[in-house]
Every structure is written in structure tokens, then in C-alpha cells.
Amino acid sequence: MRKKMYLCGIISIYSIMPQMIMLGSEMIRIHPAKKTIEYSTSQGRSWSTRYSSTSCGEFIDLLPYGNELLAVTSKGIYYSTSQGRSWSSRYTSSSCGEFQCLMDGGRELLAQTSNGLYYSTSSGRSWSKRR
């Protein structure tokens, strides 16, 4: 059974498949059931928990962005400068709706939310609706 599907550009993200990225020599993913951050140094053969606190909410999407790792969570946009070991809030206002996924648009960040497409030219600190 398929769950919700969100579209970011041409990439489809199904909630039944965990979000996974390469960051340096590690694979980092969102655990498919727990919605926490895990990492692998064995090309995905085994996984270890990297961040399991609930203070950020449930993780939904990950995006490497410059020297940061950005995350969409159930509480908003969070960022990490430690490969996901710790997280700080970047944007938690509900004015954009619920964030679903992020995409690096070059000069701006793009975000699909429950209220439509938004963009940010401030690394996700503020958002404007794309018209």
C-alpha cells in the first residue's frame, strides 16, 4: 500500500522508502519506522543510531546544503553542522503549512509544503510563497 507521495522537482519520495544521502564517507538516512537519524560506514550493510531525540520531531527529509545538513521535521526546518549528531531549529513557524520536502534550487532553497511551493534566499530562515 502506498502512502503519501511528495514531489520535489523530478524526485518522488515515498514515505515507505527512507530518505538516504551520502555525506563524506558515510551514508545517512531517516529510519523508515522510527523517523530518527542513522548512519552507515559499511555502504548500508549495517546501521547505527546517530540522533534519536524527539526534540526536533519526526524527521521527514534530508538535504546537504553547503556546510550544513538541513532536515524537514514534523516541527519545521532544522540544521546540523555535525553530520546529524546535533540539530538546531532554523524555521518553525506554521505560516507556510507543514513542510514536506526540500530541494536546492541553486540560488534559493525550494520547499514543498501543505500550502504550496515556497522559496528561501536566506538558507531557510525565512520563506515566501512561489506565485
Where are these regions (language model features)?
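Enriched but not universal
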Residues: 2-5, 10-23
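Entry beta-strands of beta-propeller and related beta-repeat scaffolds
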Residues: 21-29, 68-71, 107-111
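Conserved Ser/Thr-centered positions that define the repeating blades of beta-propeller domains
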Residues: 40-41, 80-81, 120-121
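Surface loop/turn motifs at the tips and blade-to-blade linkers of beta-strand repeat domains
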Residues: 51-55, 91-94
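An edge-strand/N-cap motif at the start of beta-rich repeat modules
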Residues: 20-52, 131
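Loop/turn residues immediately N-terminal
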Residues: 34-37, 75-78, 115-118
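Repeated scaffold domains used in trafficking and secretory/extracellular systems
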Residues: 18-20, 56-64, 96-105
